[in-house]
Amino acid sequence: QPQASWYLLLAQQPDPHLTVGDTHYADTTDPTVQWKHHVTYRRQKEFATVLRNVPTYAIWDDHDYGPNNSDGTAKGKERSLAGWKQVWGNPTLGTTDTPGAFFKFSHGDVDFFMVDSRYHRSPDKVPDDDEKRMLGDAQFAWLLDGLRNSTARFKVIVSGSTLNHSKVDGWRIYTFSRHRVFDAIKKHRISGVMYMSG
């Protein structure tokens, strides 16, 4: 079916364009199934036009990473990451020591921190204490270091997981991780921080 809403996006002449999770609903780490979903998505004429004309950056969420509400225990997550690297033209993902789909890019006076809220995530149902993680310690350190060293006027943290008070599948049920981000921004007096989610 035609997806004319993509033309509404193009009419705004965006630069850049971000897809913030659940770009498809494969709900598996099986690379063959994921690949079919990625190809189907790109065959959509309107979306293909966006990709050809607008710099596009992408982060995943549960459905394009693995099963619904999946986390760092997902079997085959390494295959998901390998496939993600093949289909999206993001900058280098993760770090030398920490795998994942997270990365940073800059546009004008804005630094975007695309965080991976799946690869190192603790299961939703474990106790909501100071052992429960949304990003994992290494990725959190990467984020904090990036925010502290950024000279951009605005720093945008981008994640497929919502920051609001929903008690389903978002930062709200990761109290320690959520407040660790807030507290670090306050402690280090980092200005211009915003949060974006899909």
Task: Walk through the language-model features, giving the residues of each.
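Metal-dependent phosphoester/phosphodiester hydrolase catalytic core
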Residues: Q1-G198
